[in-house]
Amino acid sequence: PNRHYTGLDITPAMIEKAKKKNIPNAEFVVGDCENFPFDENAFDAIICSNSFHHYPNPQAFFNSVKRCLRPGGRLILRDVTSDNRLLLWFMDNIELPIANMLGHGDVRVARRKTVMECCKKAGLKVEKFEIRKGMRMHCVVRKI
């Protein structure tokens, strides 16, 4: 009952679709994940699910997360990735180009190294980084 949820999408049509669901204690905002339109220390938690591969500048995303999370707050990041070089090559050179021909706007598949380096530069601590089912990243990051 005391919880408040904020949904963010860069596409106004998706925000309108979300608003029509009339979800209690929720607001929906048009905005960019690489430059969150929120105050500092605004959130206890940020969940980013299946959209990270659309962000051209991952460092800007993690910098926004750091700015908007309260101290001790957590980011839950879920997206596609792999530690398998062949699978990464396939996703980068076959899957993403086909998806983009269909209008998906994918930019890149996240790499473990990129996530770890971006978090470190932003001053965030990676508490957990798992790859499940061969290509599903589950990452928990804390603002220290």
Feature names for model-found ranges:
Residues 139-144:
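C-terminal lobe and adjacent flexible extensions of AdoMet/dcAdoMet transferase-like proteins
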Residues 47:
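A conserved beta-strand element that flanks and buttresses the S-adenosyl-L-methionine
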Residues 50-51:
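Short catalytic micro-motifs in class I SAM-dependent methyltransferases
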Residues 59-71:
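A short glycine-rich, Lys/Arg-flanked "PGG" loop and its adjoining helix->strand segment in the class I
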